[in-house]
Amino acid sequence: MGTAKKNAWRTWGGRILVASWLSAGVGCGASADLFVEEGLASERQAAGSTYEAESAALSGGAVIATDHAGYSGSGFVGGFTDGNKGNAAAQFTVSISAAGNFDVTLRYANGTGSAQTLSLYVDGTKVKQISLGATANWDNWGTRTDTLSLGAGTHTLRYKFDTTDSGNVNLDNLTLSAQATPPPAGSGPLYEAESAALSGGAVIATDHPGYSGTGFVGGFTDGNKGNAAAQFTVNASATGNHDATLRYANGTGGAQTLSLYVDGTKVKQISLDATANWDSWGTRTDTLSLGAGTHTLRYKFDTTDSGNVNLDSLNLTAATPPPPPPTGSGFVYEAEEQFFSGGVAKESAWLRDFSAPGARVIFTVNLDAAAATSVGLRYLNNSGTNKTLNVYVNGVFALTTTLAPTGSTWSGKTETLSLRRGLNTITYQYDSVNTGGVDIDALTVVNGKALADRGATVPYQELEAEAGTTNATVLNPNRTPGTVEAESSGRRAVKLTQTGHYVQWSAPQAANSLVVRYGMPDAPAGGGINATLSLYVNGTKLQTLNLTSRHAWVYGGYPYGDSPSTPSKPGEWDPGPHRFYDESRFLLSSSIPAGATVKLQKDGGDTAAYYTIDLIDLEQVEAPQPMPANFVSITSFGAIADDNGDDTQAILNAISNAKSTGRAGVWIPSGAFNINSRVTLDNIHLRGAGPWYTRIQATNIGEHFTGTGSNVKVIDLAYFGNVVERNDGADRAAFEGSFGTGSLIQNVWIEHAKVGYWIRPGTDGLYIVNGRVRNSYADGINLHAGVKNTMVSHVHARNTGDDAFAMWSDGAINENCTFRHDTAQLPNLANTFAIYNGRDNKLLDSVGADTHYASSGVLITDWFADLPFLGTTEVRRVTFNRTGGEQTVNFSMNAGAVWVHGVRREISGHILVEDVEINDSTFSGIKISWGKGASTNPPVNNHAISPVTLKNVTIKGAGAYGLETFNVPGTATCTNVTVTGAALGGLSNHNNRYTFNKVSGNTGW
């Protein structure tokens, strides 16, 4: 390569500075900067202070060289070669006299023939990956300009060949200059398209009337697909939301699309409705969050767009948010807080882009009682004509709503919908019969109520055994893996060992059902035992409960076996027998009144040697749901409830019939129905009478539902597997596969599966809501290897055999997936939540509690795949109770409640931890680390984890430190991080290699 050199012009936000003047009389001042799209040109050196690369601090193999011509100073810096990937860096120390925005211009050579990348760090924090276009050869030099906001004083600017970069460039110097403000492309708030920077075939035209200014811009034709663009340079007078209104013509007869880029980054695809003809003009407004100052707004005909429009002008104004919905008797559910998919975009306080079939928002609402309920949709329709959307309630079509024009103001449309007690979904969807084209702000539901602040909203009350009264033994807290206490909720339980032993509670609500989480002995050869336990209400025996330990007890090394003879495995954790608990559920013979005494008692006929009671759930179950109109029942195809026969073919035949005859879906009535092979799902609605009534039973191991396409709905049923040990080579999930676009899984209860949900690539916009995953042998929910735009919400997972909730980027990254309002409780192995690589994934408004082994409250890591973290990974508004645990087998270290851990590469995506409560962490509250951790003096790791933001984090009680780092560099910015009750101290910063920038409000460390 020689040492690692394009003559390029100075770039500014994706444009190239061609000259520093324009003649007066074209809408600009006499002195200005002219911008064009990136391309070849002669070099222009930015004015300002110049820092030679050979005088910078060099590391990781970066060296001074002189073997190529054209450099400034006494040499240039090379060594950014593949052999130094992950290490080579040049760090400039610059001085700023006054705070402001600065152009940082790097002079470089790149003779590789293609663009190469480096990473730019400011004061130790990575701010971006930069692209350095190819220069003509290694003796020619180009420049790359980045705009940075810098405070007065000294700063470090570091260009590093990170593990995610391609490197192989030479660096000559760095020029720092106060930013000159580019002129607006027009006068005032109106920017004419003919004055924008045009590229890729976009041209000025005048052959259609009605345009403003001196012309319009065309050329967005199929021949220029992937290239044509118009870039406006605009000025935002103040930080905030701004409405960017594009005036355009679209005479094609149908909606067309372009892509909108802000400051070089694509933010959305926009839809431009048809205008009457090419001489008529329409507008499209997008609300953008912009900082004060200059920005570029680029409208491009990307390869994924349909183009074929003309552009006239752009108007930028401060956005006026919709006024708050009028107050009334209803509860307001904000649209931007709901699940949405199908191209719908989120603005600061509402949703837009209901512009094509498949666009939808699903409101999750909560009621105290079933009723015909008034709901009011707050919307905006500035089209001048009526628009329509279809409305679905809990997945069933309810009506088509017509939304009258509103002009530029928000209005409301009220409907009456039949809603059930508890959680409901109300979907507003653009189907093929609709016209869409509205914005949606909120839904007001009369007699609606708030969802749980954190964690899943559930219909039952969970009561801990140790919180009741008992004459038996209360187990004391213990977190030693392999003990029954460590597997108990709150680390305590009650053990009934003698006839007459009981534990009892006062019922906080009326209930007609009961779930018991309990432990009993195993059979000597494994396989479990069956025994009874007695249920009393107000001193009178209500019924005998039939219990089993068949799905408890595992042995040996990972992944553990059902037999006590299962051998240990070298290098695998083997604590001895564990997985002591299982659960059983019961619809009761009569209801329990609120305030009644509920007692579990070991009577003379209850023959197990002991019953360890961890907790109970009390729930008032509603009556079975009826079959909706236009559904076909599986009983019409030979399925028989509760007969122990195989019903797989009947279900498959019903699905085939529903598709071929245009029926709305397939009905599975009350009762138990058996499957012994896979049931494939695509473009079908499968529905039951409710998870307490409709029960799908896997008669062997591994039968399940497989997603093979889009528009799948599975609602109101339970799946009970027949798994008794983990088999990573064979067993399947209850729900597995690709669910395409537009799918919904609601109110589904899963027990005794290997995995609850294993969602595969091709899934884009799945919503899983209002579910329970209990007693799985591996993960509860795993979004695996390329899942996009998917949300899991109001799901409660308990006693999973691996991560309760996991996003696992494996081969391909998961993008924009969210766990929100979920509860993860008592994973027997691993974490309550885990995010393995990916882009812009989120854990929000959730609760994790009582991890056991190899465990965190949330683990953020690249452990399993050499893939990056991109964008921002968010953990916000989450509570972790008694989480963290030993991780001695895999990493020879202990895990924090919040654990950010690197194994394969630098973690350079932003990690945001905000509004998080960490209570009684087993080890450290927050841990940031890298590698295996086997030695107190490991080989020095230079893979940074940065940037990290910790904001409004409370750590109350930790078995080790409040915050801990191990063998890792990087930077965390900390605001209002408080530590109390950490056994070993507030902070342990291994070798002082990690930088904590304390802003304000930090105490205890």
Residue ranges and their predicted role:
Residues 1-10:
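N-terminal secretory signal peptides that target proteins for export/translocation
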Residues 22-47:
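Bacterial Sec-dependent N-terminal signal peptides
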Residues 634-667:
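Acidic Gly/Asp/Thr-rich repetitive segments characteristic of extracellular carbohydrate-active
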Residues 635, 689-692, 710-721, 741-752, ...:
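Right-handed parallel beta-helix
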Residues 652, 656-657, 673-686, 695-742, ...:
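Extracellular beta-strand-rich solenoid/capping regions of secreted or surface-exposed proteins
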Residues 663-664, 675-678, 691, 695-703, ...:
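Short glycine/acidic-rich loop motifs that flank beta-strands on beta-rich extracellular proteins
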